[in-house]
Amino acid sequence: MQKRTLYQSGKFYKGNLHTHSIRSDGDSEPQDIAQRYREEGYSFLAITDHWIYGVHEELNREDFLVFPGTELDLELPERKDHHLVSIGLPETNRIPDDYRFERERTGNTLCTPQRIIEYMAAHGNVTIYAHPYWSKVDSTDIKNIHGLLGMEIYNHVAEFEDSNGNSETYYDHFLFVRNRTFCFACD
């Protein structure tokens, strides 16, 4: 089998920007997760626990980078949710490790996807809309969101557990309304 990409030459890196540890709903310690991904040949990882910001600088190696990040979610009526993964760069992030967003969560600071995106950008982070099909949102629920780095078009956990990890249709609609937005997949 021949590997093909859009580019014939260049440096290519494999990574995962959406995974959880035992700090939220994952089943492994952050250091064990990082070790498994390194052993599988990944170059980068973001441990994005729910409502807990993780920096994990101690897990970085010369050939492996752990991006700081979190996943924030908002419940909507009719069993729908917005899930947004925010990732920082070590040079730009201004949110401390293990920050729980308690004050922001109870007020109006993080009450809409747009406010989450703006808050995270003001603190040196970019935001990706996570697994819209699994979250049961309608494309109309997300079409007016601005400032996203991209959308997660495939989430393997959602596909494996519930057969609803493929969000290509949402991405297609979002592109039609918003023009350029990157797409991401996670395992």
Protein language model features and the residues they cover:
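A metal-dependent hydrolase metal-coordination microenvironment
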Residues: Q2-V126, A130, V137-S139, K143-G147, ...
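Short, well-ordered beta-to-alpha junction loops that form the rim of enzyme active sites
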Residues: A130-Y133, D187
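Short acidic/histidine-rich active-site segments
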Residues: R180-D187
